[in-house]
Amino acid sequence: MKVRASVKKICRNCKIVKRSGVVRVICVEPKHKQRQG
């Protein structure tokens, strides 16, 4: 899980979702998991 100021899709499997006010990137590749913070 990477915590970044700007979350971006890294590959075509990445999806941007908003969970309880937090922007996250979910992906099949675990290295691509990101959270805005």
Curated annotation (Swiss-Prot):
GO terms for cellular component: cytoplasm; ribonucleoprotein complex; ribosome. It holds the Pfam family Ribosomal_L36. Transmembrane segments: none annotated. Keywords: Ribonucleoprotein, Ribosomal protein. The keyword Signal does not apply. One of its GO terms (molecular function) is structural constituent of ribosome. InterPro entries: Ribosomal_bL36 (IPR000473), Ribosomal_bL36_sp (IPR035977). GO terms for biological process: translation. PANTHER family: 50S RIBOSOMAL PROTEIN L36, CHLOROPLASTIC, LARGE RIBOSOMAL SUBUNIT PROTEIN BL36C. Belongs to the bacterial ribosomal protein bL36 family. This is Large ribosomal subunit protein bL36. It comes from Shewanella baltica (strain OS155 / ATCC BAA-1091). The lineage of its organism: Bacteria, Pseudomonadati, Pseudomonadota, Gammaproteobacteria, Alteromonadales.
